[in-house]
Amino acid sequence: VALINNQFLPYPYYAKPGAVRSPAQILQWQVLPNTVPARSCQPQPTTMARHPHPHLSFMAIPPKKNQDKTDIPSINTIATAESTITPTTEAIVDTVATQEASSEVIESAPEAKADQVTSTVV
């Protein structure tokens, strides 16, 4: 087995003299594909031809083009404002006019009540 190792060839090729081998042994030899270097050879420089899959940077999906060209304002969700507790007093008026499912006729006026509610707003 003679190894042809030329600096201009990207991969090593094996040359087998046919006159030395018998016809049965010649049929056993197969042509090596160019993408698989022999394991006994020194490592060759990495090229894209040796990689069955391209590098991940080549498989990046480009961003979709926005057809509307509408600008979305950025909202800062991490606010650094100081939180102060401000008590507020609100008047809540409940107007209750209930009519139950009965045969009674309700003749009274709807009740109105005002409650004072103190809430804490952050």
UniProtKB/Swiss-Prot annotation:
Keyword Glycoprotein attributed: yes
GO BP: lactation; protein stabilization
Tissue: Mammary gland specific. Secreted in milk.
Chain positions found as Phosphoserine: S102, S119
Keyword set includes Nucleotide-binding: no
InterPro entries, sorted: Casein_kappa
Organism from which the protein derives: Rusa unicolor
Residues with attached carbohydrate: T84, T86, T89, T95, S102, T118
Protein name according to UniProt: Kappa-casein
Residues modified as Phosphothreonine: T98
Signal peptide: none
Main function: Kappa-casein stabilizes micelle formation, preventing casein precipitation in milk.
Family statement drawn from the similarity comment of this UniProt entry: Belongs to the kappa-casein family.
Pfam families: Casein_kappa
Compartments, record wording: Secreted
Species classification: Eukaryota, Metazoa, Chordata, Craniata, Vertebrata
Disordered as annotated region, ranges: 38-57, 101-122
Keywords for the protein's UniProt record, in alphabetical order: Glycoprotein, Milk protein, Phosphoprotein, Secreted
